[in-house]
Swiss-Prot record:
UniProt key word Membrane: yes
Listed GO MF terms: methyltransferase activity
EC numbers, comma separated: 2.1.1.-
The keyword Transferase belongs to this UniProt entry's keyword annotation: yes
Name of the protein this chain belongs to: Probable methyltransferase PMT26
Membrane spanning stretches: 18-38
Keywords: Glycoprotein, Golgi apparatus, Membrane, Methyltransferase, Signal-anchor, Transferase, Transmembrane, Transmembrane helix
């Protein structure tokens, strides 16, 4: 009888069958462990990520590390900002989230997430779920229908993985040197985040793609196929040249045309600046030694003005040392020797601003918590405190019962004004809360409103919060920062400016900026009241205006508002000037350039009207809107434009370029909810093409022409837009949190040659509203430098892209404020 064999007892060698069984069991166990590890590495950390939402942006390091250290485990510290869906903003009735988590918790989470980064999936543009990094196709299909908690966790995980991966950040800032397939080149990374906070990324490193293939399980073939299609469709310029056209991106991603446009416009931008190639080359050489520093620490400004601090208008030390304030010198700009590099605090309880047009009627009190103006001007219907709102029931002293009636009354008095046709660009001096300019939008007219920062507390700040263009400025000792002969109409409604004194120096400044044939609309008390002081002012003004050859067109009284309006017209020829009995005011010297206005003292003289029919000002511009698209008649083909072409051709090419960029890229490709954008600034406008391309949106654009750039501001006005001269080495004359979007096209690389770039970015932060957008187009080195600075402020990088030493950066400002404080002694009073 055969005996059973017991290996342990008999101490005999096990059979080969038993050995095979054990091997299979061990192998299966290892496979299961491996699958479990892969699954946990992709999903597990998402539970921790929830702790690092918008509510805890304080929990992020303040110091940026230089690129050389990134490969050694150091990383850019950036909060995964999950902004509320902008489509649901409405009146902005929800406060912006608070920040209250510690930095130690954030650091621990970042260390864990960094270990898992390499196993992250490369997103596809074919389905939204794959783009968000899901691993299970069944779960992905749920995500397409709205998703749930798992979707948010995976999305937050991807946000952090992209930002924490040192290799990814290095690639993000490297320019591509060859125009090859993106998957082969491995030098570019494009990041995108839609307005609901969902970030997508396109990693063009082929090695990463190969690693992903090895690690993926159930959806390997699908991911690989869609990744390849995404790369070929959305990135490589050669695809467009070969005639391929695919529409595989999801609703949140920009369509293929927009992504291709991001490349095309960058290439076009390089070519368009060929006339400045030498200057750019010298600048880039000078930048090499300064572009590597990425240690940025921010502090909070401690000033008397607090959340309303304007550096060049709140220089208490300089104002106290003024020898005189007779000419409103204390209301003029007095910039500190070293511009501040600290950040302005937010007012307590700051909320997302109410959207236009509701903002014209009411704003949040907590955003502009000032009541003195309501108390001082409440009886004149300027502004009232209504619960948690500040409301604007009438508009101004001269139109208590509404601005629109007043606006229509002016045109009824002088039909030639023709709002929105002949008259398009208006200057409103002493604007108050700018209701006049705010309601002129209804007549297709844009208004540059100005008022000083004076005892009428925060009047310009009210205007900007309402979504109405305005600047802090005063008629003092220097010229206004505008070219000569650009405004169609100048308006003054009880603006309290002593026009008639000192030879009419202030009124002569209006004469400088007013077009020949333009109107001066004056509705101050001397026009219709008979008090002794008013009668004397009216007499002096009448004599001065007659000597200036202005024609009194109309004097009418509005019975509803109870005010009178006098309208004058500037002459279009020099005949009257030549026939005056005495040359007072005198004619300006031929050497006096009427367009020179940056810190130029006022002169009590008049500039003659242009007699040459080819000169600007000799003819009235085309009626609006034809003037927007047509090159001004005085641009000659013999003139060389900014970009090297004949001036009219340069103008047209610039307009076509920006229409293409805005339509194909900015409107759809950057994840911006334009319904929430109202106040826009082009920090380096050339011909105003960017602003012109935004014409159909409910926005207005402040076109800034830097003082060291070609003087093209008159062209901007000629096409029915407006703007201002400015030196970006100084602060802008506006209140903090004034703009929803800033656009900087090849500005910062030029500025850092003569300015402190850190101070410039601090000014950008001051001017931009929380959740506001910054779009930067510049060389790749400058893009990297700016990105490092804004990341140190915990801003959210929506997209960054670089190719052939040119880059594009789109970021969103956060509500983060530093805990460290810097006291500005010159601003303490």
């Amino acid at each position: 009888m055969a005996q059973p064999r017991y290996t342990r007892i008999d101490n005999r060698r096990p059979s080969s069958n038993y050995c095979s069984t054990v091997t299979v069991v061990v192998f299966v166990a290892l496979c299961l462990v491996g699958i479990w590890m892969m699954t946990s590495s992709s999903v597990g950390p998402a539970q921790n990520v929830d702790e690092v939402s918008l509510d805890n942006k304080d929990g992020i390091k303040k110091q940026m590390t230089p690129p050389a250290e990134e490969g050694n485990g150091q990383k850019f510290e950036d909060a995964p900002v999950e902004t509320p869906n902008e489509d649901k903003k409405g009146d902005g009735d929800a406060s912006l989230p608070k920040e209250d988590e510690s930095s130690s918790k954030q650091d621990n989470q970042e260390e864990k997430k960094e270990e898992k980064t390499k196993e992250e999936f490369t997103p596809s543009s074919e389905t939204k779920s794959e783009t968000e990094g899901g691993e299970d196709q069944k779960d992905d299909s749920k995500s397409e229908n709205g998703g749930g908690g798992d979707l948010d966790e995976k999305k937050d995980l991807k946000d952090n993985s992209d930002e924490e991966n040192p290799d990814t950040n290095e690639k993000q800032t490297k320019p591509e040197t060859e125009d090859n397939e993106l998957g082969e080149d491995g030098e570019n990374q494009k990041q995108f985040e839609s307005d609901n906070g969902e970030k997508k990324s396109i990693d063009d490193d082929k090695k990463s793609s190969d690693d992903d293939k090895e690690n993926k399980t159930g959806n390997e073939d699908t991911e690989t196929k869609t990744e390849k299609e995404n790369t070929e469709t959305n990135v490589d310029v050669q695809v467009e040249q070969e005639g391929q056209s695919k529409n595989e991106t999801s609703g949140d991603l920009s369509p293929p045309g927009a992504q291709l446009e991001l490349l095309n416009e960058t290439t076009a931008q390089n070519g368009s600046f060929s006339t400045q190639a030498t200057e750019s080359k010298n600048e880039k050489e000078a930048q090499k030694g300064s572009g590597d520093k990425l240690d940025y620490k921010w502090a909070l400004c401690n000033t008397t003005a607090g959340p309303d601090y304007i550096p060049c208008l709140d220089n208490v030390q300089a104002i106290r040392s003024l020898p005189s304030t007779k000419h409103y010198e204390h209301r003029e700009r007095h910039c500190p020797d070293s511009p501040p590099t600290c950040l302005v605090p937010l007012p307590d309880g700051y909320k997302r601003p109410i959207e236009w047009p509701k903002s014209r009627e009411k704003i949040w009190y907590t955003n502009v918590p000032h009541t003195k103006l309501a108390e001082y001007k409440g009886h004149q219907n300027w502004v009232k405190v209504t619960g948690e709102y500040l409301t604007f029931p009438g508009g101004g002293t001269q139109f208590k019962h509404g601005a629109l009636h007043y606006i229509d009354f002016i045109q009824e008095s002088v039909p030639a004004i023709a709002w929105g046709k002949r008259s398009r660009v208006v200057l409103d001096v002493g604007c108050g809360v700018a209701s006049f300019g705010g309601f002129l939008f209804d007549r297709d007219v844009i208004t540059m409103s100005l008022a000083p920062k004076d005892e009428h507390e925060a009047q310009v700040q009210f205007a900007l919060e309402r979504g109405i263009p305005a600047i802090s400025a005063v008629m003092g000792t220097t010229r206004l920062p505008f070219p000569g002969r650009v405004f169609d109409i100048v308006h003054c409604a009880r603006c309290r400016v002593p026009w008639h004194i000192e030879g009419g120096k202030l009124l002569l400044e209006l004469n400088r900026v007013l077009r020949p044939g333009g109107f001066f609309v004056w509705s101050a008390t001397p026009v219709y009241q008979k008090k002794t002081e008013d009668v004397e002012i009216w007499k002096a003004m009448s004599e001065l205006i007659k000597k200036m050859c202005w024609e009194l067109v109309s004097i009418n009284k509005d019975t509803i508002n109870g005010v009178g309006v006098a309208t004058y017209r500037k002459p279009t020829s020099n005949e009257c000037y030549k026939n005056r009995s005495e040359p007072v005011p005198p004619i300006c010297a031929d050497s006096d350039d009427p367009n020179a206005s940056w810190k130029v003292p006022l002169q009590a003289c008049m500039h003659t009207a242009p007699e040459d029919k080819t000169q600007r000002g000799s003819q009235w511009p085309e009626q609006w809107p034809a003037r927007l698209e047509k090159a001004p008649f005085w641009l000659s083909s013999s003139q060389t434009g900014v970009y090297g072409k004949a001036a009219p051709e340069d103008f047209s090419a610039d307009y076509e370029h920006w229409k293409r960029v805005v339509t194909k890229s900015y409107l759809n490709g950057l994840g911006i909810n334009w319904a929430s954008v109202r106040n826009v600034m082009d920090m380096r406008a050339v011909y105003g093409g960017f602003a012109a391309a935004l014409r159909d949106l409910k926005v207005w654009v402040m076109n800034v022409v830097p003082i060291d750039s070609p003087d093209t501001l008159a062209i901007i006005y000629e096409r029915g837009l407006f703007g201002i001269y400015h030196d970006w080495c100084e602060s802008f004359s506006t209140y903090p949190r004034s703009y929803d979007l800033l656009h900087a096209d090849h500005l910062f690389s030029k500025l850092k040659q003569r300015c402190n770039l850190t101070a410039v970015i601090a000014e950008v932060d001051r001017v931009l509203r929380p959740e506001g957008k910054l779009i930067v187009r510049d060389d790749a080195e400058t893009i990297q430098q700016v990105e490092g600075m804004v990341k140190a402020m915990k801003w959210e990088v929506r997209m960054t892209y670089s190719k052939e030493k040119e880059g594009l950066l789109s970021v969103q400002k956060s509500i983060w404020r530093p805990s460290e404080v810097e006291t500005l002694t010159y601003a303490i009073g």
